[in-house]
From Swiss-Prot:
InterPro entries xref list: ATP-NAD_kinase_N, ATP-NAD_kinase_PpnK-typ_C, NAD/diacylglycerol_kinase_sf, NADK
PANTHER family xref list: NAD KINASE
GO cellular component entries: cytoplasm
GO MF annotation: an example: NAD binding
Catalysed conversion reaction: NAD(+) + ATP = ADP + NADP(+) + H(+)
EC number(s) per entry: 2.7.1.23
Cofactor: a divalent metal cation
Main subcellular localisation: cytoplasm
Any one biological process term the GO annotation gives: NADP biosynthetic process
Family: Belongs to the NAD kinase family.
Protein's name in the database: NAD kinase
Amino acid sequence: MKNTGKRIDLIANRKPQSQRVLYELRDRLKRNQFILNDTNPDIVISIGGDGMLLSAFHKYENQLDKVRFIGLHTGHLGFYTDYRDFELDKLVTNLQLDTGARVSYPVLNVKVFLENGEVKIFRALNEASIRRSDRTMVADIVINGVPFERFRGDGLTVSTPTGSTAYNKSLGGAVLHPTIEALQLTEIASLNNRVYRTLGSSIIVPKKDKIELIPTRNDYHTISVDNSVYSFRNIERIEYQIDHHKIHFVATPSHTSFWNRVKDAFIGEVDE
């Protein structure tokens, strides 16, 4: 049988079901002449849940223009699911028929400027959040160069359209379709009274605009980027923008549409 030429990396969590699927899928791919490559793949298949897809994204976040992703779920239905663990034959068949088509979603770019001149740069598929460890966080919010408000509360999160269904949704933010290339700024337990006021609702910021957060105190802040957590002291400002790169998923008949993903994840079957 002729080699397909497609290079594939398989990334799985440590759960027994995911490991079983990993070995089965690896064997089927080899028998069908796919190339297993964990450094320079064409397609990355994450096996597990949405957390595993985030890990796969961050492993290849510097190769986004070259890589396409597939989510294979082994537990309860996940938001980034394209295939279930009993659909391996279907997956291999679709890979054989793959023409290179892709479905693309926006990614968040985060720049943390420290007072010592260092700049830390991150990418997020879902969201990036900032909190203060032990007390109320106070930060000025600047949107596209315009001072907007002084926030007081537990923290703030900035999400992508696909990330709008994650932590952002649990905070009461809106669900945003990924064809709308925008960011969403959502408050975490804001402090509102006769003295201190914030807008009190999520803000949708278009692709060309930039969000800046300027903490007013120089102590430690905790920054979460998807499923990774960092602690920084003496932050000068943080900038959030839509990244120049997108995440690309393999566009096959099994790639679930965004609204079907939302329905399956949060609503389920609707009774007639």
